[in-house]
C-alpha cells in the first residue's frame, strides 16, 4: 500500500498572441538551429513506445499545414484525437503497441499521448510525455475531465520564446492550471508513476485512486503549521 499527500502551488500561464501566432515551421527551425536545440534534441527522436509510423505522419499532416499557427495546429490535433478515438480503460495494457492502438481506435491517456508524440516527432517537432494529475473537483455544473481519478498523461511541445506548452489529447484541450505535473520523459517507460517488483503467487491487480482538492489560505496555513507536520510524521 502506497499513500502520499502533496501540497502544490500552481500559477496559470497565459499564451501571448505573439507566441500563439507563430507558425509551426518556425518552432521546427528553432528546435534544430536555436540555442536550446541540443537540450531538446532527444525529444525530437523516436522512443521505445513512440515509433515513427507512416500512419502517424499521415494523421499529423491533416493539421500541420503550411504556415498554420503552432498552437492552433497542435490544439486541433489534440482535439481530433479526443473525438476520433474512444477512451476505454479495458482496451489496452501497458505493453500495447502504438500500431495496435491505432488499429483499435481506442485506449487511455497513455495511448493518446503516445499517438500525439509520434505525430509531432514524425515532423521532427520536439515533444515530451508528461505524467501527473488532474484537478478532479470542478465547480458545480462543470463535468470532470477524463482521467481525473487516477494518474494522467499528456504532451508538451516546445515553443520558441516560451518553452514547453502542454496539450491534452484525452480531453482535447490545452494543459492549464488544472494539470499538476509530476515528471516528464520520452514516453511512459521513462516516467511511470510507480515502479517495483512484486514477489508471490496468484494474480495481482493494481488499484489507483487520486483526489485533488482546492485549498484556501486558511487550509494552507493549517497544512504548513508545525503541529500538522508533527502529526504527519508521528
Positions of the model-derived regions?
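Hydrophobic/aromatic-rich core segments of domains that either
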Residues: 58-61, 79, 111-202
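A structural signal for short, well-ordered beta-strand segments
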Residues: 4-6, 77, 155, 208-210
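N-terminal low-complexity, intrinsically disordered segments
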Residues: 16-20, 24
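Short hairpin/turn module used for nucleic-acid contact or packing/dimerization
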Residues: 191-234
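Secondary-structure boundary elements
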Residues: 12, 24-107, 115, 186-188, ...
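Short, hydrophobic/aromatic-enriched beta-strand segments in well-ordered soluble domains
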Residues: 1-12
Amino acid at each position: 500500500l502506497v499513500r502520499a499527500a502533496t501540497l502544490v502551488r500552481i500559477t496559470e500561464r497565459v499564451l501571448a498572441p505573439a507566441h500563439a501566432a507563430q507558425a509551426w515551421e518556425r518552432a521546427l527551425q528553432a528546435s534544430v538551429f536555436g540555442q536550446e536545440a541540443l537540450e531538446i534534441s532527444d525529444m525530437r527522436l523516436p522512443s521505445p513506445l513512440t515509433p515513427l509510423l507512416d500512419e502517424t505522419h499521415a494523421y499529423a499532416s491533416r493539421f500541420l499545414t503550411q504556415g498554420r499557427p503552432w498552437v492552433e495546429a497542435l490544439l486541433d490535433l489534440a482535439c481530433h484525437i479526443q473525438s476520433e478515438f474512444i477512451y476505454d480503460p479495458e482496451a489496452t495494457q501497458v505493453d500495447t503497441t502504438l500500431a495496435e492502438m491505432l488499429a483499435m481506435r481506442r485506449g487511455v491517456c497513455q495511448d493518446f499521448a503516445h499517438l500525439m508524440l509520434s505525430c509531432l516527432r514524425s515532423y521532427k517537432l520536439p515533444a515530451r510525455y508528461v505524467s501527473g494529475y488532474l484537478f478532479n473537483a470542478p465547480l458545480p455544473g462543470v463535468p470532470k475531465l477524463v482521467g481525473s481519478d487516477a494518474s494522467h498523461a499528456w504532451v508538451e511541445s516546445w515553443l520558441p520564446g516560451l518553452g514547453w506548452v502542454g496539450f491534452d489529447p484525452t480531453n482535447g484541450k490545452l494543459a492549464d492550471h488544472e494539470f499538476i505535473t509530476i515528471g516528464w520523459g520520452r514516453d511512459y517507460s521513462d516516467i511511470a508513476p510507480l515502479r517495483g517488483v512484486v514477489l508471490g503467487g496468484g494474480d495481482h491487480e493494481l488499484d489507483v485512486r487520486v483526489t485533488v482538492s482546492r485549498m484556501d489560505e486558511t487550509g494552507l496555513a493549517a497544512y504548513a503549521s508545525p503541529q500538522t507536520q508533527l502529526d504527519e510524521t508521528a
